[in-house]
Amino acid sequence: MVGRPQVRVPRLGQRSFAAVVQEAYGQRCAVTGARILPTLQAAHILPVAEQGQHRIDNGLLLRADVHIMFDQAYLGVHPHSRSLQVSGRLREDFGNGAEFYSRAGTVIAQPNRPGDAPNRTFLEWHLDAVFQH
């Protein structure tokens, strides 16, 4: 088919998703700044099981434990300020969490290119559907 050239964003698989998210965040955890690559994971903000896609703006590079806490509702990211939200459940459930409470309200690291920043709609979904205030 002949027509106007169009920019197409390729759909990424999980490995490609992880690679582009790692690159976007300079191989640093968006929350802790950790750079130990084997411990870093590309987290989906809107999970694939909830119709989320392997899109760079649906990803955060997180240290493995931070990823688990994000998925299990202990951590969230405010969609407008991009600040870390920490659930009171962390202290209630485990009597701990000082590392994260000390970071509460701080702006998480953003990707190197502004166009790769986390999608606000996806962050709102996570705060509304997953995060436990």
Which residues are covered by each model-predicted region?
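A detector for short metal-coordination/catalytic motifs
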Residues: 2, 12, 16, 34-40, ...
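Internal active-site segments that recognize and position negatively charged phosphoryl groups
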Residues: 1-33
